[in-house]
């Protein structure tokens, strides 16, 4: 599956990397499988050992006798790559570890047996043809000075480079453009925001943002005055405001409300909304070339009224889905070489982390999968809950980010599980705050399209909540292994999407790039709910 974060590049400069390099490498295999004395909630309770962990986590934590060795302890765990089992391959792993942390998802990992077989082969002399008797016997065969490599080797090398380039293009060529990717042409475009997202229909409009200053997108004319409807090349409709309250479409089809009773928000009756949308789709003479953009940042489980929207009513979609016409995720990683990046030494020191697991939840619902999993996990490890409802306590005055920064792990549990639905719970509450996210949402492969595999822990990697708890406690006792979950900070920084101005500017950018190509959405509900 294609990933949406760029290639890693190690920046210069010192920071927490020096602290990590000087830290002692503790041996995970020395853990006995039972909790020793420690903080409250972590002692006196038996938990499963490495046998119940996923293969790529358990192999590195086994004692040496389980790997066929003798007298040597296991190597520290690498959450980003599978461990190697031979001494020669272990040296290779230590030399290539930074590159392997961000290896492409387009290539499968090499089985451990292959590494053992490779380590057992005799060393081939440099320049000797593959399969020659000299190479098989481990001898050396010298070429005459000045001749260089045979032409067959050069041809094979060129063919290999060509194949690599083609595979790279196939894996990366069709990715949706990242928001910081390329400069934008300066074609003048007017974009009208029909309602401000999450602010309600009748809130006072804020001044439009400067897209050139915020996102280096020029030629944008952002509009809030509905009298400018005929001048706009695109009109944004926020789904939540679209399906609540009386119909409020562009004139002359919209119903204008004037009294307090009329502006009271309510979910439209299905037949009423469907009839209004169908009439609008079939009889609306829009200005030439104008696009209606459906905008939504909620999951299908929390998007009522989808099926009441008529076919061909909208031209584009704007959402967190990567296959939207305008892709605006809740956040993303970008290379630190980008101008204005914060300094690289941002990994929080372990001395400030006084708690183990934190969770901030605003809507408590016992029917949700995240609440059910919390009840299972809290039986084996202490979880401090903040927010409204359930066992939550108020967020301290220092704020959410500073509170989460005091914990080693954060439960980035989504309220529903859908494709690409990865919200601020991962980007802001965990990655930006400096805690290792434990995620519950779409599958691991979906997460790895947006973040490196070694930057998070997925609940699906473990057969049970008790097995996950044992792994979290293992990381708590092995700080050198825990720090590996912050390797991505060497090369990337976190961008948090602003839902006031960023969708506005991204639509302007998309119109500039698309030109006058016509399009309409035939069945919005079937696309979004799949």
UniProtKB/Swiss-Prot annotation:
E.C. code: 2.4.1.152
Transmembrane segment boundaries: 148-172
InterPro entries given for it?
Glyco_tran_10_C, Glyco_tran_10_N, Glyco_trans_10, GT10-like_C_sf
Q: What are the GO cellular component annotations? A: cell periphery; cell surface; Golgi cisterna membrane; trans-Golgi network
Cell compartment(s), UniProt = Golgi apparatus, Golgi stack membrane
| Glycosylation site residues | 216, 315
Which pathway does it take part in?
A: Protein modification; protein glycosylation
Reaction(s) catalyzed by this protein?
a beta-D-galactosyl-(1->4)-N-acetyl-beta-D-glucosaminyl derivative + GDP-beta-L-fucose = a beta-D-galactosyl-(1->4)-[alpha-L-fucosyl-(1->3)]-N-acetyl-beta-D-glucosaminyl derivative + GDP + H(+); an N-acetyl-alpha-neuraminyl-(2->3)-beta-D-galactosyl-(1->4)-N-acetyl-beta-D-glucosaminyl derivative + GDP-beta-L-fucose = an alpha-Neu5Ac-(2->3)-beta-D-Gal-(1->4)-[alpha-L-Fuc-(1->3)]-beta-D-GlcNAc derivative + GDP + H(+); an alpha-Neu5Ac-(2->3)-beta-D-Gal-(1->4)-beta-D-GlcNAc-(1->3)-beta-D-Gal-(1->4)-beta-D-GlcNAc derivative + GDP-beta-L-fucose = an alpha-Neu5Ac-(2->3)-beta-D-Gal-(1->4)-beta-D-GlcNAc-(1->3)-beta-D-Gal-(1->4)-[alpha-L-Fuc-(1->3)]-beta-D-GlcNAc derivative + GDP + H(+); an alpha-Neu5Ac-(2->3)-beta-D-Gal-(1->4)-beta-D-GlcNAc6S derivative + GDP-beta-L-fucose = an alpha-Neu5Ac-(2->3)-beta-D-Gal-(1->4)-[alpha-L-Fuc-(1->3)]-beta-D-GlcNAc6S derivative + GDP + H(+)
A GO molecular function held by the record: 4-galactosyl-N-acetylglucosaminide 3-alpha-L-fucosyltransferase activity
Q: How does the protein associate with the membrane? A: Single-pass type II membrane protein
Q: Using the UniProt annotation, give all residue ranges assigned to the region (Disordered).
A: 1-48, 66-113
Q: Which Gene3D superfamilies match?
A: Glycosyl transferase family 10, C-terminal domain (3.40.50.11660)
Disulfide bond sites: none
Bias (Basic and acidic residues) occurs at 88-106
The protein, known as: Alpha-(1,3)-fucosyltransferase 4
